Regions:
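Cyclophilin-like peptidyl-prolyl cis-trans isomerases
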Residues: 1-141
Length: 141
């Protein structure tokens, strides 16, 4: 069975995710380590572009930060569809902690960014994001 994650927002809303640990094992392991250590607690979705993506995971809150290391891309057959969870990066093999949830299919990102999960419930909460929406926590089990 795939790993599951829950993003609990500051307002109590939950976004439940299925993680693709068979297709992106190192990316999922990194996300799990960061999540369960509390790295994401209190971090905002700093980049919200309706019709494109909601991006979070930057400890600086502006898209410039990360965990202090980089991970390799794990390109796989999963596509960027509505609700896809993927790693943000500034070039190949430069991911770390920043991730995004796609609002709509983004075929131009397929084969470029690692898709490592999908929203299974709570996408309506992501649809309500307006920017600077704060995560209380992310936990992976």
């Amino acid at each position: 069975m795939s790993k599951q994650a829950v993003i609990t927002m500051e307002n109590g809303q939950e976004i439940k995710l299925e993680l693709f640990d068979q297709d992106a094992p190192n990316t999922v392991a990194n996300f799990e380590k960061l999540a369960n250590s509390g790295f994401f607690d209190g971090i905002v979705f700093h980049r919200v572009i309706p019709g494109f993506v909601a991006q979070g995971g930057c400890p600086n809150g502006n898209g410039t930060g990360g965990p202090g290391y980089e991970i390799d891309c794990e390109i796989n057959p999963n596509k960027h569809e509505r609700g896809s969870l993927a790693m943000a990066h500034r070039g190949p093999n430069t991911g770390g902690s920043q991730f995004y949830i796609a609002y709509a299919p983004q075929p131009h990102l397929d084969g470029v960014h690692t898709v490592f999960g999908k929203v299974v419930s709570g996408m309506e909460h992501v649809d309500e994001f307006r920017g600077r929406d704060k995560m209380a926590s992310i936990r992976v089990s």
